[in-house]
From Swiss-Prot:
One of its GO terms (cellular component) is cytosol. The keyword Nucleotide-binding applies. The gene is glpK. It catalyses: glycerol + ATP = sn-glycerol 3-phosphate + ADP + H(+). This is Glycerol kinase. Sn-glycerol 3-phosphate binds at residues 12, 82-83, 134, 243. One of its GO terms (biological process) is glycerol-3-phosphate metabolic process. Homotetramer and homodimer (in equilibrium). Belongs to the FGGY kinase family. It comes from Clostridium botulinum (strain Loch Maree / Type A3). PROSITE patterns: FGGY_KINASES_1, FGGY_KINASES_2. Pathway: Polyol metabolism; glycerol degradation via glycerol kinase pathway; sn-glycerol 3-phosphate from glycerol: step 1/1.
Amino acid sequence: MEKYIMSLDQGTTSSRCIIFNKKGEVVSVAQKEFTQIYPKAGWVEHDPLEIWGKQAGVAGEALNIARISPEQIAGIGITNQRETTVVWNKRTGMPVYNAIVWQCRRTAGYCDELREKGIDKTIKEKTGLMLDAYFSATKIKWILDNVEGARELAEKGDLLFGNIDTWLIWNMTKGKIHVTDYTNASRTMLFNIHELKWDEELLEILDIPKSMLPEVKPSSCVYGETDEILFGVSIPISGDAGDQQAALFGQTCFNAGMAKNTYGTGCFLLMNTGEKAVDSKNGLLTTIAVGIDGKVEYALEGSIFIGGAVIQWLRDELRMVKTAQETEKYATEVEDNNGVYLVPAFVGIGAPYWDSYARGTILGLTRGAKKEHIIRAALESMAYQTHDVLKAMEEDSGIELKALKVDGGACQNNFLMQFQSDILGVEVDRPEVVETTALGAAYLAGLAVGYWKDRNEISQNWAISRSFAPAMEDEKKEKLIKGWHKAVTKAMDWEERE
């Protein structure tokens, strides 16, 4: 009986299930979008019950599409939107509030208060993260402080916290297992990435009971088995990693200095730094890349909040395009950006600037500016932001990048990939299998159950679909980058501080 690995890929806008074979090829995909909830400006939420329902639904669907039985699944890997925070009652299994999404800025003011007390230095030292509303810690605190009765329940030991991976595993095992992996834990702003444990001092500062937190385990190990009610059989849940770390693993960036960029809702650039946690002097995050083979490996990460989301905005709010694919056609219908720059700081701006008060701007408009120029400027913004992060990474790590591996939806846009290569001045490699996030989770799950032997076997699966080489003169490139940096300064510190 041929065996497969199932990957549950729980993203920011959709829940997906992808089934892979031994060669790391996609056998089937099922996907369902779910509701984005915006209660106030800058606030973003999801319904955890809807996420669980849709995730369970696509798992069954993917099996049907592949025409295989649950018995043929050797293991399940989970990858998830990171930082998004769920708090639920362990007795009833019901969330006490909606999931607060990583993009949500509601705790920015509280982060400012902590910064004034100098807590940001402690946080960076212990967790490798910047003090920011992006991470889970202040979201948990917000729920405890603002949801009626939540703090009392938490003090009694009745509330559990989890990122989406933990929430899914808890539901898949019918409440038997409350666990996360090193990569997800490293994004909470509560986990000491050097000592590999929840940090008592940070829990005290934020007033979060330790009893709420899941057990932290490696990214590749058997956490437990699915309850039979789900598939009719028990299947090992054997891999777990946050989406960006899973993509780094799926891109087989196993050695220090190897890097990938995922062009999803946000853009995420990660560079493997091996067993050394490199402290960033340039506004990047030091994070755990993977916990495997009895050790952890670290990465530098630059988080760009708005990547592909700028295309959704062109499509849904401005109605300039009907589909994301059309952006490539429009961008290539004009020779250049005509001096137009779009800074998509809709929810502030991430690495290496970290300004919660920046807002989106379109600059350099003249009477000759057309829809095509704005669309082109939107695509170019992803490449410029990636450039800024990469330069910071090279400076921190002392490693000059030779090539960049790419994945995520927008990496299918050939105009963007060529422009990215031009602006970076390095080769950009798009792999055959672009489902690298789900693939990384599958690899982690498969290694834990012996489906794949080791990382060498996995590396042989990676193949280039298309390579983009830089073709822009340096002078033109420098001029464009200079214009971009000028535009970013105009977007910063726009929103009034309360």
